[in-house]
């Protein structure tokens, strides 16, 4: 993509209302634009990151055996009355009426819709286990939207729902999603900490939140220092058994590990999984015939990932004082190609044409060298190919690693081959 043909409205100065680095860089790098409190338009560069995150999630969810669906944003209130949850939600639920004066709502979550989706069709234990997921926009009218996409009112979420005939099956589904989440977050370059958590308005008796460590996190995490070692093994039962909790579940008096073993860190929540048995299937009459001929309520779980929140979380984890440093797996473009002067245009064009255009953002604008370098560092593409005077005299370009800052000279053909084969 040629920058001269692209829409990338970057900002030179830090917006005064943006308090944390991910919010500042999201606005300055032209990822998002706020249109109301907690509501954002996603601009081209930000949308590419969002789609790359979605692709990783879809790939791992599909590998787990989950099946993608798409449920409506707007839901009838009667489904929530049926589950008994309509009055549990306060003003964070956006309630509306249609032209027939029927009560509707903009879904903050989809447990009721998911239960309704299967209850008239799934009637036998032979139809289970089943796991359905979607990537869909949601709305929660937060009292204090803040931190950009980290705590917005409208947000993109991956939510999945598992259906099993009994507790053992439901626990298997829960453990599978726990393991799948670890794989998803690790592919994004993140180190997730799974902590025991309160089930909140979703309900149930088993729940884990997934956090990444960040000084700007709103939660305080208490976890055994062995957690990071076990993370590599992806041994779910061991990870679940080790001490790891958020601040609302930590009691210093009953903590089973010593102070020397206990790590205390700030964290950003990026995912949450729940097992809630028949909390929804019982009132909504979602049941199956078991293997021994009995009619039993379906055991359910739900599994959420904040897709749009992940954009902010990744920036919090990967940045410096110059800008964002995207992990290659989620970067909007892999390479930033910088043309430093008009007389090297032919060499820069050659490199651009030789590489995949959807992996390269080619700065072919007439701005100053300083502006070009600053902008490319700000948007944080993993690699920069800098085409200067040596491209004419010696057929040499500079290749910069954005994460390490290391700059290496390469012959033009060498650089083309290097990035064409990776």
UniProtKB/Swiss-Prot annotation:
Group of enzyme by EC: ligase
Subunit structure: Homodimer.
PROSITE patterns hit by this protein: AA_TRNA_LIGASE_II
Gene Ontology molecular function, alphabetical: ATP binding; proline-tRNA ligase activity
Gene3D superfamilies: Anticodon-binding domain, Bira Bifunctional Protein, Domain 2
Annotated compartments: Cytoplasm
Phylogenetic classification of the source organism: Bacteria, Pseudomonadati, Pseudomonadota, Alphaproteobacteria, Rickettsiales
Protein's name according to its UniProt entry: Proline--tRNA ligase
Keyword Phosphoprotein on entry: no
GO cellular component: cytosol
Keyword Protein biosynthesis: yes
Family, similarity comment: Belongs to the class-II aminoacyl-tRNA synthetase family. ProS type 2 subfamily.
Catalytic activity of the protein: tRNA(Pro) + L-proline + ATP = L-prolyl-tRNA(Pro) + AMP + diphosphate
Function: Catalyzes the attachment of proline to tRNA(Pro) in a two-step reaction: proline is first activated by ATP to form Pro-AMP and then transferred to the acceptor end of tRNA(Pro).
Chief place of localization: cytoplasm
Keywords annotated in UniProt: Aminoacyl-tRNA synthetase, ATP-binding, Cytoplasm, Ligase, Nucleotide-binding, Protein biosynthesis
A Pfam match: HGTP_anticodon
EC number of the protein: 6.1.1.15
Gene Ontology annotations of biological process type: prolyl-tRNA aminoacylation
């Amino acid at each position: 993509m040629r920058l001269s043909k692209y829409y990338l409205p970057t900002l030179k100065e830090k917006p005064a209302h943006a308090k944390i680095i991910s919010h500042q860089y999201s606005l300055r790098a032209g990822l998002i634009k706020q249109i109301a409190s907690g509501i954002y338009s996603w601009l081209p560069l930000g949308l590419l990151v969002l789609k790359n995150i979605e692709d990783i999630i879809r790939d791992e969810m599909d590998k787990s055996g989950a099946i993608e669906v798409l449920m409506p944003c707007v839901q009838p209130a009667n489904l929530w009355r049926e589950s008994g949850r309509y009055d549990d939600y306060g003003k964070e639920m956006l309630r509306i009426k249609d032209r027939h004066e029927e009560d509707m709502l903009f879904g903050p979550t989809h447990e009721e819709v998911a239960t309704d989706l299967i209850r008239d069709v799934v009637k036998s234990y032979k139809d289970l286990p089943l796991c359905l997921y979607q990537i869909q926009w949601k709305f929660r009218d937060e009292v204090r939207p803040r931190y950009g996409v980290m705590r917005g009112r409208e947000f993109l979420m991956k939510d999945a729902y598992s259906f099993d005939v009994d507790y053992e099956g439901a626990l298997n589904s829960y453990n599978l999603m726990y393991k799948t989440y670890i794989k998803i977050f690790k592919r994004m370059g993140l180190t997730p900490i799974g902590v025991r958590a309160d089930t909140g308005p979703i309900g149930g008796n088993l729940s884990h939140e997934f956090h990444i460590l960040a000084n700007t996190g709103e939660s305080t995490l208490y976890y055994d220092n062995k957690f990071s070692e076990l993370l590599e093994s992806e041994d779910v039962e061991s990870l679940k058994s080790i001490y790891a909790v958020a601040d609302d579940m930590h009691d210093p008096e009953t903590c089973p590990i010593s102070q020397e073993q206990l790590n205390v860190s700030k964290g950003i929540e990026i995912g949450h999984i729940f097992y809630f048995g028949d909390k929804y299937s019982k009132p909504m009459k979602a049941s199956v015939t078991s293997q021994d001929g009995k009619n039993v309520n379906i055991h359910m779980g739900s599994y959420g990932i904040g897709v749009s929140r992940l954009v902010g979380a990744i920036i919090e984890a990967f940045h410096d004082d110059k800008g964002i440093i995207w992990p290659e797996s989620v970067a909007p473009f892999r390479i930033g190609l910088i043309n430093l002067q008009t007389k090297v245009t032919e060499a820069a064009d050659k490199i651009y044409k030789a590489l995949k255009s959807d992996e390269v953002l080619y700065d072919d604008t007439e701005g100053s060298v300083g502006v070009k370098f600053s902008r490319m560092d700000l948007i944080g593409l993993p690699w920069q190919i800098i085409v200067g005077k040596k491209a004419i005299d010696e057929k040499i370009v500079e290749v910069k690693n954005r994460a390490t800052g290391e700059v290496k000279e390469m012959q033009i053909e060498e650089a083309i081959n290097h990035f064409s084969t990776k």
